[in-house]
Amino acid sequence: MTICIFAGTFNPIHEAHLKVAEYALKHYGFEKIIFIPAFIPPHKDINSDLAKHRFEMVKIATAYEPRFEVSDIEYKLGADGKKSYSLNTVKKIKELYRIDGKINFLIGTDAFEKIESWYKADELSKLVHFIVFQRGVKLTPKIGFDFEMAQMPFIDVSSTDLRKNHTENNNLKKVEEYIKKNGLYN
């Protein structure tokens, strides 16, 4: 089975995340995209109390596509308060799905631009083929990282903008309802 990881904080998940995953299914022929909401991301300061809500919102948002799966692997790996390092997640996914070669990993240019600062980035680079999507950040070459630039047009939407502006997301009404019902991002 050809799978691809799509890890992120998804705080909250939005249309651009879904468009990226749909594009990857169509243009790369993946049989499954595994969304992995970060439990305690090492690179962002977010309220860990929102973790269960972020996980639920990703489940709600991806329910329409049977080839989308949402994994709680980082919640299990971080149950004792450990940070969610991509290296540990990738190793566990490779083990669970019996993947011998490199695993595909969707990532935005904003995150990939900082990849060299990630936990054990050199070791991670040996396990992953990155598919990099434009996020409005100019990318400098990353020596030693197996990656390709996706040819998908840039979608100018971010979770930060959605939270700050409380923008209606017409394609994700159920997520919007979940946010309101649970009083998130007030």
Which role fits each region the language model picked out?
Residues 1-186:
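Nucleotidyltransferase catalytic core that binds NTPs
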